[in-house]
């Protein structure tokens, strides 16, 4: 199969599969000769900020000369973005090779009556094949959905776990309360393994604390009160993070205030791992300043920003940053996936910002929502002075 044919095949997987058990994923990895002891794993779950935290940690480890694999989702342009090794996405040739290796195992399993892996499970197996082949030492894994039953949660002895901010999302799968969703995310916490977590939502934080205590896992909570802004330029933020005995000034190359929490989670995680990695405080601070992560209040051109917020909490943070950055009434170009809670998203977008105009489009994907549906929702929420257009 060609690269294009492989991509088309993978995109078709959701149409004929459903999520499998962790035992199914373990069986697939075992047949690929992948073993947990080959990696030092940092496992990251949460509703928002997972990718950014992974990116900060990845940047520090790579700059220090470590062999690092980074598995994240979703991708922005091409699927190879999900598999990053030493700071660079895998090549198309490596992508094809990993697909062929996994497909061979999948064929064997199907011949024995076992189900085909789901979309995310398939990509996870491809990533693990690549990371093993390239002999990475540190492996940063971002969960796909939830935590407890996520395909990435097949490893029992990670080096460290991190849980970012938690909000209502995928309620039909994870539960319809913060407590339930936090419980699913906390499912990545392992016996005796340190966990760093965002404590800005006390309800979620208490669930995480209780889980950590039950697992005898050392835990470190990052509160909003521990963060203090020094300066925001529109491209960078200078701020201070204090955990009671360590005070550090950090500079991050992002204009969005929510990245302060993500950077602090990453800094605390790397501090906890300092004996393991040998990376000192000054090196951590310096490397974090060089972090790049696309699609998170990313300035593409002067006065043009991209943001991939996909739930109400993420969009609320997006709106907050628009209010701080915009010098005039801003224009919104908006689209969303069909399965997301677009009604709640539109409600948040209409509450706080007086948009000059709103342009609705469709993401070039079969899951993109019809702009006419979005238009109806914006019309129901808008005030008289707002204009809504569609493209």
Regions inferred by a protein language model and the residue ranges of each:
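Positively charged, low-complexity/disordered segments
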Residues: 389-391
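ATP-dependent carboxylate-amine ligase catalytic core
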Residues: 29-30, 34-37, 63-156, 172-174, ...
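C-terminal helical cap/extension that packs against the catalytic core
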Residues: 201-210, 214-220, 303-304, 344-387
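Aromatic/hydrophobic pocket-lining residues that form π-stacking "cages" and hydrophobic walls in ligand
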Residues: 57, 127, 208
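Cofactor-binding loop segments of dinucleotide-utilizing enzymes, especially the Rossmann-like FAD-
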Residues: 73, 165, 200, 334-338, ...
């Amino acid at each position: 199969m060609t690269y294009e044919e492989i991509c088309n095949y993978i995109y078709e997987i959701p149409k004929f599969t459903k999520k499998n058990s962790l035992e199914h994923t373990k069986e697939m990895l075992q047949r690929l000769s992948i073993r947990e002891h080959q990696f030092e794993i940092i496992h990251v779950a949460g509703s928002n900020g997972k990718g950014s935290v992974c990116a900060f940690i990845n940047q520090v480890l790579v700059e220090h000369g470590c062999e690092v694999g980074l598995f994240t989702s979703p991708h922005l342009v091409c699927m190879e973005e999900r598999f990053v090794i030493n700071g660079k996405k895998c090549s198309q040739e490596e992508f094809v090779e990993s697909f062929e290796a996994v497909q061979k195992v999948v064929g064997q399993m199907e011949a024995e009556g076992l189900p085909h892996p789901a979309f995310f499970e398939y990509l996870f197996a491809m990533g693990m094949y690549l990371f093993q082949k390239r002999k990475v030492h540190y492996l940063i894994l971002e969960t796909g959905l939830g935590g407890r039953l996520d395909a990435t949660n097949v490893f029992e002895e990670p080096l460290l776990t991190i849980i970012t901010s938690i909000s209502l999302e995928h309620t039909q799968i994870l539960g319809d309360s913060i407590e339930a969703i936090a419980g699913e995310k906390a499912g990545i916490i392992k016996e005796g393994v340190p966990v760093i977590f965002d404590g800005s939502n006390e309800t979620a934080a208490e669930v995480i604390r209780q889980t950590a205590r039950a697992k005898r896992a050392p835990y470190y909570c990052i509160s909003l009160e521990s963060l203090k802004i020094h300066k925001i330029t529109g491209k960078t933020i200078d701020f201070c993070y204090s955990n009671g005995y360590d005070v550090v000034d950090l500079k991050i190359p992002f204009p969005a205030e929510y990245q302060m929490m993500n950077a602090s989670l990453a800094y605390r995680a790397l501090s906890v791992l300092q004996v393991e990695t040998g990376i000192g405080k000054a090196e951590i601070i310096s490397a974090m300043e060089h972090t790049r992560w696309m699609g998170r209040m990313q300035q593409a051109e002067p006065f043009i920003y991209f943001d991939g917020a996909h739930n109400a909490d993420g969009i609320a943070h997006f709106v907050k940053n628009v209010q701080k950055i915009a010098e005039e009434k801003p224009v919104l170009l908006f689209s969303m996936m069909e399965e997301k809670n677009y009604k709640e998203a539109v409600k948040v977008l209409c509450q706080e910002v007086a948009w000059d105009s709103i342009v609705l489009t469709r993401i070039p994907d079969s899951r993109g929502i019809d702009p006419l549906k979005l238009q109806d929702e914006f019309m129901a929420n808008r005030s008289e002075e707002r204009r809504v257009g569609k493209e």
